[in-house]
């Protein structure tokens, strides 16, 4: 007996896209690619494509659906571009292209590309089919093939490519005998409207197929049940009481019943049924074959119109009696009740009604037999006498309708009780006998009557005890699993109601329980295996996992002991549509083999692989030392059966069977490795980035009003910069005057003391303070005095040169220009001969960044003001070498050294200013964003353009290029 919910089959919504494509393929070679990821990676390839290309399924997964990995030097570039355009435009198209197998053998393919849409009419997949047309692209006349060899090659090519031949030659004459080709090719030729969609949907049936659990079929089954009981009652009555259907009304009713049963036969040829695995079978061919092998013959015999023959007037009595007896065959209609009993017992009240009807039907049949026995024994045809001990004779005397012999007429006994009285009396006797009551007013007297009475008592006691005495016990024994199933369902329903589980999740839970029960029939496999001994348990496990061991080449070299050890560790998992086998981020501790159904692998909300029968997913535990984290979700599309083995159990077996471990590691190829994350870019993301880039490119520049605070702030920066430049120009004019007038510097400095006091306001964290140039101007006089006295005491080794060292870089540059006049007196050749070598130790005085000063400019251990003090006499100037050298170096070299030193110092200052300005610009942009958000109500006409302040780096020294 099947479970209560099992007669409906597995009817949850499923994504049967892969099954539909495989069913329609008919040996077509195809791949499926994701249309939402860049390069359209392959998510599924059937065995035909793998055989045709020479690649394993795991090798082509995540490769481009355009099959660029099969391109070669002879592949046409224009065709490749057309293929790419077809993918980019989501079009349907076909091409002839030369590609290469894995062994680099060139093959001509006829490629068809078709987009697959989901329920939102969005293209999510590409279906690409491949047909080998090499035989039609190569010339028949080949020098290497002569005679019969050439003919054999052509014949072999034609016989192996019948489907391709029909596709390439659609104009076939009507009278020609053509072979049936792939239905998938027909689908692709008709258009994308009839292509299967990639979505979850309830199981669909063909238009002329009726679901066995629909309302119409359920109502029809109850009508058939009622008519079956009608037949079971009238057929025995008509046969026993020998009634001819002379009444037209009864004849019409019986004929209508026969027609209804004939219609039921026709409906059975178009009604789905539940397969052995719990699936709903809707294939018309399978339905017809199943019905022909089971109940068709019995139903046909029970529907023959036997009453039509008896309705004729001039029918021989023997023939009429024969056909009346054949009416008993109609009792075979009770088989309809037997095979659909599980449909009716779903309803509690129907069970009690059926049991009472069965008891009454048994009493009716016994009453008909009881009357037949009395009617057979009451008359003696040989002696034309009546037996006084028959129960019919006693009944006739009791009710006052005795039998009388008509000697002048028919010569037969006439009279006696009516048929209604006889039937009621017979039913009364059988009911009292079946219930063991027996009042004795009707009693058997002949031997046959007594034997039948004994049989009635035995049958009655059995029926009474079975149906009425032990109904509860019998039901508990017969439907123990069903009761447990209902108990489990009630517990689950109460749990879901108690914890207020969402409706969608509740439906998934209930569907999973129903489907799991349908597969296991409520049998606890682990409990059964525990009863069996170890050897028998291992044999059972090998049988349960035989599909995995036979389909995968990794187990071919395993010994019997190894297979038994592996089989003991395998577990069978049943998954309902929508179940997640792995969540992204959780540990991958199992290796899963797909036995039936299909699954999808989802990474970043995109389908990166579709797994079907024969695929393997998980992790390569035998090659990795650490436990992996799943990089994707694995979700069931249909009802799936997975054979799973844990990581620790597999490693334990592989460690023990070392020889098998090498073969297993080499031959087992994962269809999808959950440890590895696929790096891809979505086409939608690429398009969105391109749109944003174009939007930024076409945006109008930001315009601010003239009185905006940011514009006033930048105006203040410009004023400060102009003041600083004016001060620097004043300093340069003062230094030029020093060079020209020599000792008159002191008077000129005093006269222009106010100009030297000019301040430069710099941007810094603290309030601005003036930076005076007075120190630089006062030190200029002493430097020039020393330049005009080269042989003085300052050239000695103890001369520290403190005053020149305190000058700024620009002032020291002017000093070098003044010294150049004296250096010109030294000949170039003499200077080159006696130029002392500088020590490397004293020449590597680099600047290091230290704490920030008030102006925000980084300072160094060697301040620009004190750079001269930190250098040796040889580094400061060649003229400060040892006293024994009475000559000076070439003025061009000294000038270049001084310029480079000044350039380095200025560059450091400019870098510091740039860093500070960058920080200020970031803060100003944040201020601007806040102000713009608050002042968004301003009109666009009141704004003006904001220009970035000129970077200090743009005002480089004219010597920066050197």
Swiss-Prot record:
Chief location bin: membrane
Motif (Selectivity filter): 436-441
CDD domains cross-referenced by the UniProt entry: CAP_ED (cd00038), PAS (cd00130)
Membrane topology recorded in Swiss-Prot or TrEMBL: Multi-pass membrane protein
Glycosylation sites: 388, 406
Region span, CAD (involved in subunit assembly): 897-937
InterPro entries membership: cNMP-bd_dom (IPR000595), cNMP-bd_dom_sf (IPR018490), Ion_trans_dom (IPR005821), K_chnl_volt-dep_EAG (IPR003949), K_chnl_volt-dep_EAG/ELK/ERG (IPR003938), KCNH_animal-type (IPR050818), PAC (IPR001610), PAS (IPR000014)
Post-translational modification: Channel activity is regulated via tyrosine phosphorylation/dephosphorylation by SRC and PTPN6.
GO terms of biological process kind: cellular response to calcium ion; monoatomic ion transmembrane transport; potassium ion transmembrane transport; potassium ion transport; regulation of cell population proliferation; regulation of membrane potential; regulation of presynaptic cytosolic calcium ion concentration; regulation of synaptic vesicle exocytosis
Region Required for phosphatidylinositol bisphosphate binding, annotated ranges: 151-162
Compartmental location: Cell membrane; Nucleus inner membrane; Cell projection, Dendrite; Cell projection, Axon
Domain PAS: start-end pairs: 14-94
Gene3D superfamilies per UniProt: 1.10.1200.260, 1.10.287.70, Jelly Rolls, PAS domain
Residue ranges annotated for the PAC domain, each copy included: 93-145
Quaternary structure (record): Homomultimer. The potassium channel is composed of a homo- or heterotetrameric complex of pore-forming alpha subunits that can associate with modulating beta subunits. Heteromultimer with KCNH5/EAG2. Interacts with ALG10B. Interacts with RABEP1. Interacts (via C-terminus) with CTTN. Interacts (via cytoplasmic region) with Ca(2+)-bound calmodulin.
Domain notes: The segment S4 is probably the voltage-sensor and is characterized by a series of positively charged amino acids at every third position. Conformational changes of voltage-sensor are driven by an electric field generated by a potassium gradient across the membrane. The C-terminal region interacts with the cyclic nucleotide-binding domain and contributes to regulate channel gating.
Name recorded for this polypeptide: Voltage-gated delayed rectifier potassium channel KCNH1
Name of the gene this protein is made from: Kcnh1
């Amino acid at each position: 007996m099947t479970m209560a919910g099992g007669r409906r089959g597995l009817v949850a919504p499923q994504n049967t896209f892969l099954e539909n494509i495989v069913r329609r393929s008919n040996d077509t070679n195809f791949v499926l690619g994701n249309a939402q990821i860049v390069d359209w990676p392959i998510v599924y390839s059937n065995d035909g494509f793998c055989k045709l290309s020479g690649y394993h399924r795991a090798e082509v997964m995540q490769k481009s659906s355009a099959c660029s990995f099969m391109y070669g030097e002879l592949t046409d570039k224009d065709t490749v571009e057309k293929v790419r355009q077809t993918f980019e435009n989501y079009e349907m198209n076909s091409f002839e292209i030369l590609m290469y197998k894995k062994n680099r053998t060139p093959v001509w393919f006829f490629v068809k590309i078709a987009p697959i849409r989901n329920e939102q009419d969005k293209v999510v997949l590409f279906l690409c089919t491949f047909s080998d047309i090499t035989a039609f692209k190569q010339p028949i006349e080949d020098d290497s093939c002569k005679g019969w060899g050439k003919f054999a090659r052509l014949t072999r090519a034609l016989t192996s490519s019948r489907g391709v031949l029909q596709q390439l030659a659609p104009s076939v004459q009507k009278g020609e005998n053509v072979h049936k080709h792939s239905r998938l090719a027909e689908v692709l030729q008709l258009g994308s409207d009839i292509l299967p969609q990639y979505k979850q949907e309830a199981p669909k049936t063909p238009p002329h197929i009726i679901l066995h659990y629909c309302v119409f079929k359920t109502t029809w089954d109850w009508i058939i049940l009622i008519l079956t009981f009608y037949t079971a009652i009238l057929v025995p009555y008509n046969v026993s009481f020998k009634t001819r259907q002379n009444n037209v009304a009864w004849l019409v009713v019986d004929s209508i019943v026969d027609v209804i049963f004939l219609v039921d036969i026709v409906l059975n040829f178009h009604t789905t049924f539940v397969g052995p695995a719990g699936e709903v079978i809707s294939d018309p061919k399978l339905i017809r074959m199943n019905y022909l092998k089971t109940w068709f013959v019995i139903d046909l015999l029970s529907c023959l119109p036997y009453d039509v023959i008896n309705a004729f007037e001039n029918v021989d009595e023997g023939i009429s009696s024969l056909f009346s007896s054949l009416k008993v065959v109609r009792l075979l209609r009770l088989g309809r009740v037997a095979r659909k009993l599980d449909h009716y017992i779903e309803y509690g009240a129907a069970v009690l009604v059926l049991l009472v009807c069965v008891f009454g039907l048994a009493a009716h049949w016994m009453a008909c037999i009881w009357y037949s026995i009395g009617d057979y024994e009451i008359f003696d045809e040989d002696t034309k006498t009546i037996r006084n001990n028959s129960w019919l004779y006693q009944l006739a005397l009791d009710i006052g309708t005795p039998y009388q012999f008509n000697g002048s007429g028919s010569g037969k006994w006439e009279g006696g009780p009516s048929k209604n009285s006889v039937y009621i009396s017979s039913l009364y006797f059988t009911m009292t006998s079946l219930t063991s009551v027996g009042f004795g007013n009707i009693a058997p007297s002949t031997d046959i009557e007594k034997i039948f009475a004994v049989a009635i008592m035995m049958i009655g006691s059995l029926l009474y005890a079975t149906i009425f005495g032990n109904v509860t016990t019998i039901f508990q024994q017969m439907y123990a699993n069903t009761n447990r199933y209902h108990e489990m369902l009630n517990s689950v329903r109460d749990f879901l109601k108690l914890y207020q589980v969402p409706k969608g999740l509740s439906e998934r839970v209930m569907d999973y329980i129903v489907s799991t029960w349908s597969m296991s029939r409520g049998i606890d496999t682990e409990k059964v295996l525990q009863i069996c001994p170890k050897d028998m348990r291992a044999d059972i496990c090998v049988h349960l996992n035989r599909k995995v061991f036979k389909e995968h080449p990794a187990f071919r070299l395993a010994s019997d002991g190894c297979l038994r050890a592996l089989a003991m560790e395998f577990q069978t998992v049943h998954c309902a549509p929508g179940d997640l086998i792995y969540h992204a981020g959780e540990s991958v501790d199992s290796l899963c083999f797909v036995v039936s159904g299909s699954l999808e692998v989802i990474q970043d909300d995109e389908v990166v692989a579709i797994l079907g029968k024969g695929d393997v997913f998980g992790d390569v535990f035998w090659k990795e030392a650490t436990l992996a984290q799943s990089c994707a979700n694995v979700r069931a599309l249909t009802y799936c059966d997975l054979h799973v083995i844990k990581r620790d159990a597999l490693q334990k077996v592989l460690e023990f069977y070392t020889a098998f471990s090498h073969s297993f590691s080499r031959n087992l190829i994962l269809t999808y490795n959950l440890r590895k994350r696929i790096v891809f870019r979505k086409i939608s993301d690429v398009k969105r980035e391109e749109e944003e880039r174009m939007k930024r490119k076409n945006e109008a520049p930001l315009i601010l009003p003239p009185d905006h605070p940011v514009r006033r702030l930048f105006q203040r920066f410009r004023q400060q910069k102009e003041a600083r430049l004016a001060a620097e120009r004043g300093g340069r004019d003062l230094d030029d005057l020093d060079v020209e007038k020599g000792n008159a510097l002191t008077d000129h400095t005093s006269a222009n003391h106010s100009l030297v006091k000019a301040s430069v306001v710099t941007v810094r964290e603290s309030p601005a303070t003036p930076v005076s140039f007075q120190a630089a101007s006062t030190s200029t006089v002493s430097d020039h005095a020393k330049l005009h006295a080269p042989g003085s005491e300052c050239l000695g080794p103890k001369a520290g040169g403190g005053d020149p060292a305190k000058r700024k870089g620009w002032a020291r540059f002017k000093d070098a220009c003044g010294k150049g006049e004296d250096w010109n007196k030294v000949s170039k050749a003499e200077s080159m001969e006696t130029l002392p070598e500088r020590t490397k130790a004293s020449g590597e005085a680099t600047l290091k960044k230290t704490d920030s000063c008030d102006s925000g400019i980084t300072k160094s251990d060697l301040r620009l003001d004190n750079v001269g003090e930190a250098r040796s006499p040889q580094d400061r100037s060649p003229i400060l070498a040892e006293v024994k050298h009475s000559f000076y170096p070439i003025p061009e070299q000294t000038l270049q050294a001084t310029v480079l030193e000044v350039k380095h110092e200025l560059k450091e200052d400019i870098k510091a200013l740039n860093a500070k300005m960058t920080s200020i610009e970031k803060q100003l942009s944040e201020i601007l964003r806040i102000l713009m958000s608050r002042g968004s109500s301003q009109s666009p006409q009141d704004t003006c353009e904001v220009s970035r302040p000129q970077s200090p780096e743009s005002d480089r020294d004219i010597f920066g290029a050197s």
